[in-house]
């Protein structure tokens, strides 16, 4: 049966990203948020929220949900109103559409006919429906009805690493497979008005944005038709951090998605990340974490700061993660793929020798509910100028 398996490692062959057109400027968001939620009388809470926004290091975010939507669905702005139906009515339509936009860009960069796509993986924490966003995205793209689909719900911020892990396994175990993997989250699922007793809600309102990212993954790139690897996916791993239960979570309730984020998350990640690195890179003989490039999910400024400090990383290691956080906020599962896209584009623009900022080896990290850590050892490819 070995003839059915690919001979080489899977690679990312193309990347596409998409965001809604509506933009939220972070400096203006506290005034906007308390106005549209009819909460301007909560002056002390508004000042707390302004400080959270100021410390976020986010400049702007994209958001599907605009003021017109809120006028049409006024109950969405109330703190715990039963609005799940109204939210899902929007999201079951908009999540596949935004995912399709990212996929179309990836397919265009790939340069091959979409009939060559054999598998589709879709992940989202924004919506649950049957048939799922995978089905609707496939229909919107006009993919073959026999494309093999995988739909994953409620992974959250580590989902970008998960889709790469599964895409790698599929591509390497099915010769000729071309896997379209897409992450899409739209935060209309958790937008609601403020409450004095729910400061975690304010953090979520301050940092989350909407986005979709898609990659095409395959082994044995066919350079005769123009396929070119961007990054090789060398190995993958997933772990649940010790003593982390309940630190990151999300719960589907009648009011929508209720988000949990414990203040100890940055410390938990920074205290455990080196063990993950040692397990991943000991087989390669690497122990200097400044000698690799980093594709890190920017869950928030505090996480990046703590990891940087714990591992004594040079400031430039998280430049792409910080850029994506600044320009888009935390887009959940798709964010780390935005960082991957930013890294390869910046490497080209700055004349680096490889897609990994001039380095050969790198790591991709996603962090999310559990607290779950997803990691991928990545190998860059030389850039030909």
Swiss-Prot record:
The gene is PKSG4. InterPro entries: Chalcone/stilbene_synt_C, Chalcone/stilbene_synt_N, Chalcone/stilbene_synthase_AS, Polyketide_synthase_type-III, Thiolase-like. It is an enzyme of class 2 (transferase). Belongs to the thiolase-like superfamily. Chalcone/stilbene synthases family. Pfam families: Chal_sti_synt_C, Chal_sti_synt_N. The active site is at residue 157. Keywords: Acyltransferase, Cytoplasm, Transferase. Its main location: cytoplasm. This is Polyketide synthase 4. One of its GO terms (cellular component) is cytoplasm. The keyword Repeat does not apply. GO terms for biological process: polyketide biosynthetic process. Polyketide synthase responsible for the biosynthesis of secondary metabolites. Expressed in glandular trichomes. PROSITE patterns: CHALCONE_SYNTH (PS00441). Its EC number is 2.3.1.-. One of its GO terms (molecular function) is acyltransferase activity, transferring groups other than amino-acyl groups. PANTHER family: CHALCONE SYNTHASE, HYDROXYMETHYLGLUTARYL-COA SYNTHASE. SUPFAM superfamilies: Thiolase-like. It is found in: Cytoplasm. It comes from Cannabis sativa (Hemp).
């Amino acid at each position: 049966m070995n003839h059915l398996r690919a001979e080489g490692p899977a690679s990312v062959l193309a990347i596409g990203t998409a965001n809604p057109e509506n933009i939220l400027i972070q400096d203006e968001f506290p005034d906007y948020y308390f106005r549209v939620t009819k909460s301007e009388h909560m002056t002390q809470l508004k000042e707390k929220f302004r400080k959270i926004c100021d410390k976020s290091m986010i400049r702007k975010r994209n958001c599907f949900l605009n003021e017109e939507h809120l006028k049409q669905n006024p109950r969405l702005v109330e703190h715990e109103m039963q609005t799940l139906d109204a939210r899902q009515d929007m999201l079951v339509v908009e999540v596949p559409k935004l995912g399709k936009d990212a996929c179309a860009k990836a397919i265009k960069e790939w340069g091959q006919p979409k009939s060559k796509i054999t598998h589709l993986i879709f992940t989202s924490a924004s919506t649950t429906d049957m048939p799922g966003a995978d089905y609707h995205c496939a229909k919107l793209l006009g993919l073959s009805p026999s494309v093999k689909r995988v739909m994953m719900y409620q992974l959250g911020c580590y989902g970008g690493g998960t889709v790469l892990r599964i895409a790698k396994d599929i591509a390497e175990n099915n010769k000729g497979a071309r896997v379209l993997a897409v992450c899409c989250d739209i935060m209309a699922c958790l937008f609601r008005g403020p409450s004095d007793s729910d400061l975690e809600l304010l953090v979520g309102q301050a940092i989350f944005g909407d986005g979709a990212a898609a990659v095409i993954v395959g082994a044995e790139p066919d350079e005769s038709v123009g396929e070119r690897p961007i990054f090789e996916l060398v190995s993958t791993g997933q772990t649940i951090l010790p003593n982390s239960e309940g630190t990151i979570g999300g719960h589907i309730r009648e009011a929508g998605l209720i988000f949990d984020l414990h203040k100890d998350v940055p410390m938990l990640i920074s205290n455990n990340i080196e063990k993950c690195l040692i397990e991943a890179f000991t087989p390669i003989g690497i122990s200097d974490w400044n000698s690799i490039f980093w594709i890190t999910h920017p869950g928030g400024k505090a996480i990046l700061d703590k990891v940087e400090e714990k591992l004594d990383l040079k400031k430039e290691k998280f430049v792409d993660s910080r850029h994506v956080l600044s320009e888009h906020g935390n887009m959940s599962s798709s964010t780390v793929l935005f960082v991957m896209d930013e890294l390869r584009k910046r490497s080209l623009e700055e004349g680096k020798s490889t897609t990994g900022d001039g380095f050969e080896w790198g790591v991709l990290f996603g962090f999310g509910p559990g607290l779950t850590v997803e990691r991928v050892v990545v190998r860059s490819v030389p850039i030909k100028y």
